[in-house]
Amino acid sequence: MAVLTHNQASQKVDELRKKLDEWAEDYYAKDAPVVEDAVYDKAYQELVELEKQFPDLVTSDSITQRVGGEIKSDLSKVEHPVPMLSMGDVFSKDELKEFDERITKLVGHPVAYNVELKIDGLSLSLEYTAGKLTRASTRGNGRVGEDVTANAKFIKDIPQTLPEPLTTEVRGECYMEKEAFAKLNAERDEKGEQVFANPRNAAAGSLRQLDARITKKRNLSTFIYTWVNPPKNITSQHQAIDEMNRLGFHTNQTGQRLESMDEVFKFIDEYTAKRNDLSYGIDGIVLKVDDLSLQNELGNTVKVPRWEIAYKFPPEEQETVVKEIEWTVGRTGVVTPTAVMDPVQLAGTVVSRASLHNPDYLREKGVRIGDTVKLHKAGDIIPEISSVVLNKRPKDSEPYQIPNKCPSCGQDLVHLQDEVALRCINPMCPAQVEEGIIHFASRGAMNIMGLGPRIVKQLIDKNFVNDVADLYHLTNEQLSQLDHFKDKSITNLLTSIENSKQNSAELLLFGLGIDHVGAKAARLILEKYKNLEKVSQLTVPELTSIDTIGETIAESLTAYFNQPSAQKLLQELRDSGLNMEYLGTVEEEAPDNFFKEKTVVLTGKLSDFTRSEFTKKLQDLGAKVTGSVSKKTDYLIYGADAGSKKDKAEKLQVPMLTEQEAIAKIEK
């Protein structure tokens, strides 16, 4: 860090505090971080160093003197009898050595550590009275958290009653397993809802719900690792973990009691290599002085315990070269850029594409075709370009020019007011029509089985379908002209199209793909007004009278139905026999089939369906779709360019099916 004058340091401290406060609110209060942990940590450490150099600049409201984030939600507030402190963190093995040397100096002799995985989730406190769960709360700002007792009752691994009548408090981490996260995001994507950026956000958003029924559906898990007031016979951290496990708490059994830093470093190296194979997310390793009496002797600072430290994993990065920038048109006309890169192995998978989101983001990153870029996975899940390696930029490189024509129909692209996205506003744009029909047929909407992207594209190319109403006039003769579409597939598709006419009207409303009208909004509107034709005549005030339906949704829906083309489409659908009434929804158990109760993994590029559609198709059949191959996997289904998962399946002798073989099994 450059040497600063006092005035320069004061200005820099103010800038860092403002930035960190904004980021902390996004992270803690909104469960929607806008920067990577590594970016936040770097800024935080810079502030810590400046406050060390200029102690007079330290203030009580500095983020370095606080725990977590301020509480801004509608959940009831809970005061913690014993503050829930943050944890100090380091980013290198040298810093860990310094921590160990500091502890040794303070207590006068070497100590043993209980070394545990740092779970990437949301801190949680559980209080019991006479063995009964009486209160669950989040950390909040360390002094005051949020009451999530009602929600905790729906987390399966939290014991509601202990085997002994203890009055006590334990603490741990609430998290979402990678498989549950993938399933939740696939469902939200299918319904047109915003997906979560990573499992930590998903867990936090799911636990901090006002409606406990939502928490129940989210399949959360916990690891308990702290006993606030253990019985006197519990004298060590590893003993506390074992006893909490005996009492029925879900504890992480990977922790080890280690007596040397060489052993600690070996543990770190082992789990740095293993982290992508775990079913849950970890972002580091935690060292805790194992002896509880020494923990009490060492005590706490204002913000963190002196007896524990977290070693944070560095974000895994790889360098690759941008070969091209593709622009794709979504069903609402938003045109999104994607960087297409040389394939690289990153965090357990082969990555060759990363979203560039919108023109502003692309300009900010400064990415050009031919650039070498650093690539990481946001939340260990989503590929993201960290930066451009400028010293490797080709000499003949030129700034990338944002297109002004739609890549599908060639019409001018526009920026709508208050939007960063580029849009094509041509309602007959082939890409929008195609995406709109795919959405209409999706599981969350009309659930027309067998109508995947490949089939939709052929129907449009052959001019058999120009809008969703045309689906209800398809004939056996037309479908027989499609490539690789056999008699049974034709019969199944026509049957599914016919069956969709009986769907409840909220599925049809959602299927129309009206901007901002997701599955939940469609259901709420039809629950109140019962009939879709009536909904098409509603005013903005009538729509906003429904709880949670705001002006954005109401204005978008009324603007859509004010178009003569929308009224014409609705009339055509009614004339084709589609139900316009709200019927509610009924979930049915999957019938017996090849994939029922089987554990399945998908890998490679699929040609007939998107990954999300195929996942839902298998789940509808009662299959469990997971993200990693193990001895428990029943089948691996693979498409083109299958990578390490296929290799692992071969090694474990897991049965494998091509995409077409799997489809044949589904259609039997």
UniProtKB/Swiss-Prot annotation:
HAMAP family linked: DNA_ligase_A
Residues at which Zn(2+) binds: 406, 409, 424, 429
Encoding gene (name): ligA
Family matches, as Pfam families: BRCT (PF00533), DNA_ligase_aden (PF01653), DNA_ligase_OB (PF03120), DNA_ligase_ZBD (PF03119), HHH_2 (PF12826)
Family designation: Belongs to the NAD-dependent DNA ligase family. LigA subfamily.
Keyword terms, alphabetized: DNA damage, DNA repair, DNA replication, Ligase, Magnesium, Manganese, Metal-binding, NAD, Zinc
Keyword Thylakoid recorded: no
Catalytic activity, reaction form: NAD(+) + (deoxyribonucleotide)n-3'-hydroxyl + 5'-phospho-(deoxyribonucleotide)m = (deoxyribonucleotide)n+m + AMP + beta-nicotinamide D-nucleotide
Source organism of this protein record: Lactobacillus gasseri (strain ATCC 33323 / DSM 20243 / BCRC 14619 / CIP 102991 / JCM 1131 / KCTC 3163 / NCIMB 11718 / NCTC 13722 / AM63)
Binding-site list for NAD(+): 37-41, 86-87, 116, 139, 173, 288, 312
Protein's name according to its UniProt entry: DNA ligase
Function of the molecule: DNA ligase that catalyzes the formation of phosphodiester linkages between 5'-phosphoryl and 3'-hydroxyl groups in double-stranded DNA using NAD as a coenzyme and as the energy source for the reaction. It is essential for DNA replication and repair of damaged DNA.
EC number assigned by the record: 6.5.1.2
Organism classification: Bacteria, Bacillati, Bacillota, Bacilli, Lactobacillales
A single GO BP: DNA repair
